[in-house]
Amino acid sequence: MPPTVTAAEPVTTTGHVLPGEADYHALNAMLNLYDADGKIQFEKDREAAKQYFLQHVNQNTVFFHSQDEKLDYLIENEYYEREVLDQYSRDFIKSLLDRAYAKKFRFPTFLGAFKYYTSYTLKTFDGKRYLERFEDRVVMVALTLAAGDTELAEKLVDEIIDGRFQPATPTFLNSGKKQRGEPVSCFLLRIEDNMESIGRSINSALQLSKRGGGVALLLSNIREHGAPIKNIENQSSGVIPIMKLLEDSFSYANQLGARQGAGAVYLHAHHPDIYRFLDTKRENADEKIRIKTLSLGVVIPDITFELAKKNEDMYLFSPYDVERVYGVPFADVSVTEKYYEMVDDARIRKTKINAREFFQTLAELQFESGYPYIMFEDTVNRSNPIAGKITHSNLCSEILQVSTPSEFNDDLSYAKVGKDISCNLGSLNIAKAMDSPDFAQTIEVAIRALTAVSDQTHITSVPSIEQGNNDSHAIGLGQMNLHGYLARERIYYGSEEGIDFTNIYFYTVLFHALRASNKIAIERGTHFKGFEKSKYASGEFFDKYTDQVWEPKTDKVRRLFADADIHIPTQDDWKQLKESVQKHGIYNQNLQAVPPTGSISYINHSTSSIHPVASKIEIRKEGKIGRVYYPAPYMTNDNLDYYQDAYEIGYEKIIDTYAAATQHVDQGLSLTLFFKDTATTRDVNKAQIYAWRKGIKTLYYIRLRQMALEGTEVEGCVSCML
């Protein structure tokens, strides 16, 4: 019997409203209006979520008479990947669906439900009908990642549907679908200083963007504008034309995938084209050089800060000459270490700019555009446990892994395949993880899920990405809902207790993540390539955990862990883990990275990443539907005080919180800085210096609160008044 549909309209944002019922969009808007007693109407948003199903989702969902009918239809019509389901018995698949549906999951917010149905769920090929509910998507993700392991599939369903673990968008969106992109979030590529590498990088960017991932590229090794080519002076065009080629490539590849084509480029602060590079983001930049859609990142070593502190000039070095003198690409040389040696070396062409003016320019641009991102090169490499150099980050500034150069033949085939980087991401909801019946298991299941993403990804069109993934099995376990959790427990973000919790939480997560990776290495009898040269193998990584006691400094945090029945690892625990790691290794070269978590935090009902909320009631513009309102998780009319927004909290407390987490994270954390509209470029520079001093690894966007509408707020409007 063919499936039936209960309504004839396509999937649009309008629904069928019965007389006397409020439209779900109108109900959601009431979240932004106080009631007669001056209270926020949280119940209106819950009602909006309910009405969204009654008025819209249920009426546009294909109805099947049984699970068998549904599964057969989706496989035969090439909606689901047969290979995924063939790893299990039909009885098991049905029992897993029953397990998911028995949880009685409900979206707590309208935006969560709306995001899920517009962006993630499987639809008919004409886009007019829904073929999955949330439970079906969770089951398909679990079946895909568990790869035939029924016990892991059951655990994954529990962790995801209970909201403790949320795979990143590409994994959650694509898993189990026949027509799909890759489950990987993003990629990082190096470009070397030759035409073959540049040409191949453009092709790689197209290939990766087509598959739905953001791509970040390193430009630091490209010879500067005016450098010689084949010993003829003033020939090179520098980095700007390459940026233009990349920007056009991403806008083209955008047409092929479900996600926007997105790219970032990173340049070293001591590259002679640095000002040209930054000028591409100026509002008044000439169209010939203006870069509108590429994200920009700058790699800044310690020496740049030291020169600015002394108000000295900073020298910019020709990458072409540096590579000739040192025999390695510019990005692989430590500028801090070799700075004065390079200044004195007559073979290396150099120009100079004022170091303070450079920082002033950075701040001006961040005011204008929010860019560039910043990577603190020496901080990143000092805390890197893996042999080799980290040269740049990704589109969200949280991926920090070692890459190595590739070499190409004239026809752009690989003469030597280097190591490039892919990001296999997913995040824990801190509040739900703290509520977990088994904290260690929650982390282990998450690590196994992310490892599966790495194991199942084969991007053969870009051999350096494939090589890097096969060698490293690198993953990035993230975190979200820190502010939501702290507020729920009546702790202020950035307070002594807030920072204490962040420290101990990340400390405990690290222990269990390493232990899980060590377990996988033991089970498979192998570890990541290059483990022998790592600080894990030497034992150096573990010194800070075995040589000192890590425990809560405040009674409140001690109590939170005790009440949650979560054991805080002791020095003895670390000694045992160190012994096992040195003996058997770990499977994943990298384990943690904290991304900004956009859409998945709405579905999971979390505050995004580990930064504070930008507002108590967030306003989002969502396609044709227009304004949608999202209430901060766990917020009630009784605990509003604990939801100070990021602009009120200020950069110091945000940086202090991130610093507490950073010391336990092998990669990076997306850190956005928020400033009130009264801020100056001096304030931005002070924040950058404070972040550098505190051991922060990267800075993501700068956000300025726009107060242009001051004095025009609607009376009694929550998002304006709070």
Swiss-Prot record:
GO terms for biological process: deoxyribonucleotide biosynthetic process. GO terms for cellular component: ribonucleoside-diphosphate reductase complex. SUPFAM superfamilies: PFL-like glycyl radical enzymes (SSF51998), R1 subunit of ribonucleotide reductase, N-terminal domain (SSF48168). Keywords: Allosteric enzyme, ATP-binding, Deoxyribonucleotide synthesis, Disulfide bond, Isopeptide bond, Nucleotide-binding, Oxidoreductase, Ubl conjugation. It catalyses: a 2'-deoxyribonucleoside 5'-diphosphate + [thioredoxin]-disulfide + H2O = a ribonucleoside 5'-diphosphate + [thioredoxin]-dithiol. The active site is at N394, C396, E398. Under complex allosteric control mediated by deoxynucleoside triphosphates and ATP binding. The type of nucleotide bound at the specificity site determines substrate preference. It seems probable that ATP makes the enzyme reduce CDP and UDP, dGTP favors ADP reduction and dTTP favors GDP reduction. The record marks C186, C423 as: Important for hydrogen atom transfer. The record marks D193, R223 as: Allosteric effector binding. There is a cross-link at K310 (Isoglutamyl lysine isopeptide (Lys-Gln) (interchain with Q-Cter in protein Pup)). Substrate binds at T169, S185, C186, G214, N394, L395, C396, S397, E398, P596, T597, G598, S599, I600. Disulfide bonds join C186-C423. Belongs to the ribonucleoside diphosphate reductase large chain family. Tetramer of two alpha and two beta subunits. This is Ribonucleoside-diphosphate reductase subunit alpha 1. It comes from Mycolicibacterium smegmatis (strain ATCC 700084 / mc(2)155). The lineage of its organism: Bacteria, Bacillati, Actinomycetota, Actinomycetes, Mycobacteriales.
